[in-house]
Amino acid sequence: MKALRKQKIETANIQVGDQMVIPLAELGEFTATAHKVTDESVMFIFDEYVTCRPMNNCSTNKGGFEKSDLKKWMDTVLFMAFPEELRDKIYGLTIPTVGQIVGHEDEWDNKNLEPDSDEQLPLMKECKNRIACFEDQLTWGWLRNATKEGFSSARFANVYYGGYA
């Protein structure tokens, strides 16, 4: 019989699929999974949404994600919610791109969303890893890509309940 066991271990070598529980000040404790590991960095993505916020306080995607109200909140409030020992190791907070979550196969995405050159993350090839909840309720979440101006000047891509962007 084969069994998959999860154990807590101390390690300096993070691998894709490793998970860690991160206490976020007044937001609660959240599990994050390592999705990409390089010699210089590790990309963790929270398994659940830590908050439910608009991308911008007004209906616009001008400036993209980098100039959004959500990014400003992440760089200030969310960043400070991390434990101090992790803040020293964080090289920037962001949200995934369409490419990282579902790849670049969808014709509609390629035609209507700002492009990215990111490859689909290995764990995201399984639909179950693209689905997330907020406060134990299945919901959708933002992706970094804004819609192109010819389609809409107010929208961003998102990943839906079924794991599709």
Each language-model region and where it sits:
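Collagenous Gly-X-Y triple-helix signature in extracellular proteins
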Residues: 1-165
